[in-house]
């Protein structure tokens, strides 16, 4: 599956890149946003990603746009320290496209997808001491149930947690297919088009990568390094992420905050029906944007 950037036109419209501008793509991935920004104006892009496998996409862009893009392999929660330590200032815009990428899902060895057999990993950076195997084989039943419920919205979380614990008593759960089969054995699809393992895999991935904590830290750090009139744009894919962005943006726009921001759009921006037809992944995407006033 080719990774198609979601809400690309809408992101560019909000960002409005200009010649001489300096922009940060905090979630480089396959480079879709970075490429679009570089194409739209004679500007510079600093790209950030915790997954070192993205360097192949960066190399392609660096050849096409020499001296205009630089990649850092780092978590975006460290974005302020990263840019400060490299003396990068005058940031005109920062974009986030959060969540797992198609290339991560498509690689069975990364262990993100129940559609491809592979080791239980799900780590976005491959350096984490915690992975999906740790989650299913080491955590207490109550912790497993609460995480699957809170991060996956799975109402059968306790049933799933009990099944996982019973299965690991017999042998270590090693692969994505093994885990998916355990979940499916106690949660039945019925008429739903959604695979019973979907919410459980989402919850484990969020736990492994501390995605919600990273997101909150990342956008707060990004807000501190924007120049006056700089824009901060975040695209999310599920309600937990969007709630964090909405809350942080609301706090930043409150009168009396250290740096004053304003919402670029009062209502959240969603994908058009045309985009959803081409890229079904866009259905759940939401874009929020703010601008620093002072």
From Swiss-Prot:
InterPro entries in UniProt: RsmH (IPR002903), SAM-dep_MeTrfase_MraW_recog (IPR023397), SAM-dependent_MTases_sf (IPR029063)
Molecular function as annotated in GO: rRNA (cytosine-N4-)-methyltransferase activity
SUPFAM superfamilies in UniProt: Putative methyltransferase TM0872, insert domain (SSF81799), S-adenosyl-L-methionine-dependent methyltransferases (SSF53335)
GO cellular component assignments: cytoplasm
Domain of life according to the entry: Bacteria
Residues given in the record as S-adenosyl-L-methionine binding sites: 31-33, 49, 76, 97, 104
Catalysed reactions, semicolon-separated: cytidine(1402) in 16S rRNA + S-adenosyl-L-methionine = N(4)-methylcytidine(1402) in 16S rRNA + S-adenosyl-L-homocysteine + H(+)
Pfam families assigned to the protein according to its UniProt record, in alphabetical order: Methyltransf_5
UniProt subcellular location: Cytoplasm
Annotated GO biological process: rRNA base methylation
EC number(s) on file: 2.1.1.199
Major subcellular site: cytoplasm
Keyword vocabulary terms for this entry: Cytoplasm, Methyltransferase, rRNA processing, S-adenosyl-L-methionine, Transferase
Family: Belongs to the methyltransferase superfamily. RsmH family.
Classification via HAMAP family: 16SrRNA_methyltr_H (MF_01007)
PANTHER family listed in its UniProt record: 12S RRNA N4-METHYLCYTIDINE METHYLTRANSFERASE, S-ADENOSYL-METHYLTRANSFERASE MRAW
NCBIfam families for this protein: 16S rRNA (cytosine(1402)-N(4))-methyltransferase RsmH (TIGR00006)
Function as written in the Swiss-Prot or TrEMBL entry: Specifically methylates the N4 position of cytidine in position 1402 (C1402) of 16S rRNA.
Name the UniProt record assigns to this protein: Ribosomal RNA small subunit methyltransferase H
Lineage: Bacteria, Pseudomonadati, Pseudomonadota, Alphaproteobacteria, Rickettsiales
Gene behind the chain: rsmH
